A protein has these predicted regions:
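A charged, aromatic-enriched C-terminal amphipathic alpha-helix characteristic of glycosyltransferases
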Residues: 163-193, 200-201, 205-214
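Conserved donor-binding/catalytic core segment of Leloir-type glycosyltransferases
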Residues: 6-8, 13-34, 40-43, 56
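Short alpha-helical donor nucleotide-sugar binding micro-motif in glycosyltransferases
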Residues: 82-83, 90-95, 110
């Protein structure tokens, strides 16, 4: 997560303001499960409510039908194409919020962790993998999967209710370090050390633990 935590938060290409917020999306445009269709359904309602908002859509692929559909919004919807790792980090750090409207096929929300590390407000579909990372909405806002109307509502609420959004950002910043590879590696090694030293003793993990350590303990106990 370190490259995202250290990314510039003032890149003028991506930076939003209170009056003109930016909402970022990152994903393969022509891969349906990445959810661009869901975001496209939400955009008209958001722009009606927040006319100066800008949507920054990054990712490879054409999705020409959606591009044509959104062309009427002019500069309010910007297709960036594929972006470098450096630009990805700058976009996540500089944008007002990041939206992950994926509809399925996500085993772990690594992009949510990256956005959390960058310090942006996170909005995601309520897939189990995303809900787990965001602690059921404590670290980011969730919307009903595949529901563009609900996504629009959550984006508008996130932009308008700054104190609540900032509280989620602060909570996310306090826990995102647990996903750093150095931390995860240390935890994995600790689990293996524990397994070797307690080979004949059953280890009881903390009930309901969602940490990497807790999950590995569960696996070793089975």
């Amino acid at each position: 997560v370190a490259p995202f935590a250290g990314a510039s938060k003032n890149d003028p290409r991506f930076q939003g303001t209170e009056d003109a917020p930016t909402i970022s999306f990152l994903g393969r445009l022509d891969e349906p499960r990445k959810g661009l269709r869901v975001l496209a359904d939400a955009i008209p309602t958001v722009l009606e409510s927040v006319p100066r908002a800008r949507f920054l859509i990054a990712g490879r692929g054409q999705a020409q039908e959606i591009r044509d559909e959104l062309a009427r919004f002019g500069d309010s919807v910007v297709f960036l194409g594929g972006v470098s790792d450096e630009d990805k980090a700058a976009m996540l750090a500089s944008a007002t919020c990041y939206v992950a409207p994926q509809t399925g096929g996500e085993s772990f929300g690594i992009v949510l962790v990256e956005a959390m590390a960058a310090g942006t407000r996170v909005i995601a579909s309520d897939l189990k993998a995303f809900s787990d990372v965001l602690a059921d909405g404590r670290y980011g806002a969730l919307f009903s999967n595949e529901d563009g109307g609900d996504l629009a509502r959550v984006i508008i609420d996130t932009l308008r209710d700054a104190p609540a959004a900032q509280a989620r950002q602060k909570a996310a910043s306090q826990v995102v370090g647990r996903y750093d590879w150095a931390t995860v590696t240390d935890e994995v090694l600790d689990v293996y050390d524990m397994a070797l030293s307690t080979a004949h003793t059953r280890v009881t993990p903390a009930p309901g633990s969602r940490t990497m350590l807790g999950r590995l303990r569960d696996a070793l106990d089975d």
